[in-house]
Amino acid sequence: CLARCSHPNIVKHVLSMDLDGMLLIVMEYADGGDLYKQIKARQPGMKYFKEHEILFIFLPLCLALDHIHGKRMMHRDLKTANVLLTCTGLVKLGDFGFSRQYEDSLSKPVGSTFCGTPYYLSPELWRRAPYSKKSEMWALGGVLYEVMALKRPFGGKNMDELIDNI
């Protein structure tokens, strides 16, 4: 899916090749790390992002998702670790390993594979319902919450507690 995307807020696909049965993908390098690490670095002193900083992070992410949705694709693993940053402050959506093309109707499910990162999965995914655009929006809301609060919206001592909290 990444090869079909060309947007300033999506990591660029440079090259794909098969090397002895292994798929190698070369992508643009985001030299500023990822959003998860930026959040972790702010946690000790609770150095919250200012409102304009949140906007500069969240708006490009929304534009990237709008672009891939416009191409009838879904990311399916939206999380702060997959929001990459450049040293100049650009936000880039990366890691399209779980992304899938969807049918003409957004109401239809997208793939039958259970995938994603537990903290960002919507309640219906935990009930093993198929992935849909609603699930993608749930994860987007989780990312926004994490940027604003410097912590994930849901947690737990173990997976069962996390699922109950979601």
Question: Language-model segments: which ranges?
Answer:
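AlphaC helix of the protein kinase catalytic domain
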Residues: Y36-Y48
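Conserved catalytic-loop aspartate of Hanks-type protein kinases
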Residues: E136
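A conserved loop-to-beta-strand element in the N-lobe of protein kinase catalytic cores
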Residues: D20-E28, Y36-K37
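Activation segment signature within eukaryotic-like protein kinase domains
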Residues: I57-F58
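Protein kinase catalytic-loop region centered on the HRD/HxD motif
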Residues: L63-M73
